[in-house]
């Protein structure tokens, strides 16, 4: 099962039944109730304290997550973490936004463009398989904008593994702030989200 060693001490982590641990275990941070430390019109600060040994990880870990609406009409996301013992940590953000403003609508009618011509292949256990797949002529081809739902029900092995779009897209211009990574547009609301 999943394990790691730090300073000569081995830690066995919660096994997902497939010999791995995903998202820090179950329940993961996404299933925890976070405390609201600050909330106003422009910012919300959330905090979660993971107790020592939770899902097998050493150290009490305090994670602070800040979402800020900036004067540049953007959303900044900032993570901070402090631990009482050496541990492993790889925080990420899986937030998603329905820019329609209508929570009864799904995102499937929204148009998406992604600056990517390759994705990471996943094996049947939803693990990165170590191979990059071209997106051309596949449901993952968002090099020309189209509705998210247009191809989501296609007969595609990679869609079947994850039950939809839950893949890593390899960007053509990574880290280049002059080129967007993705653009999402909702025709009904007129809103655009640029990442």
Which ranges hold each PLM region?
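An exposed, glycine/acidic-rich loop-and-rim segment of catalytic or binding clefts
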Residues: 1-194
């Amino acid at each position: 099962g999943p394990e790691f060693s730090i300073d000569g001490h081995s830690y066995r982590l919660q096994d997902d039944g497939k010999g791995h641990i995903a998202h820090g275990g179950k329940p993961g941070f996404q299933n925890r109730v976070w405390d609201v430390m600050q909330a106003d019109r422009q910012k919300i600060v959330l905090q979660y304290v993971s107790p020592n040994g939770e899902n097998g990880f050493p150290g009490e870990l305090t994670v602070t997550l800040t979402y800020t609406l900036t004067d540049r009409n953007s959303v900044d996301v900032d993570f901070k973490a402090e631990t009482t013992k050496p541990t492993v940590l790889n925080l990420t953000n899986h937030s998603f936004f329905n820019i329609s403003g209508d929570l009864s609508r799904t995102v499937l009618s929204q148009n998406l463009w992604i600056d990517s011509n390759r994705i990471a292949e996943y094996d049947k256990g939803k693990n990165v398989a170590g191979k990059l797949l071209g997106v051309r002529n596949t449901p993952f081809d968002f090099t020309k904008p189209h509705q998210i739902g247009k191809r989501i029900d296609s007969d595609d092995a990679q869609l079947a593994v994850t039950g939809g779009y839950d893949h890593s897209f390899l960007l053509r211009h990574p880290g280049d702030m002059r080129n967007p990574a993705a653009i999402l547009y909702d025709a009904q609301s007129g809103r655009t989200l640029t990442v």
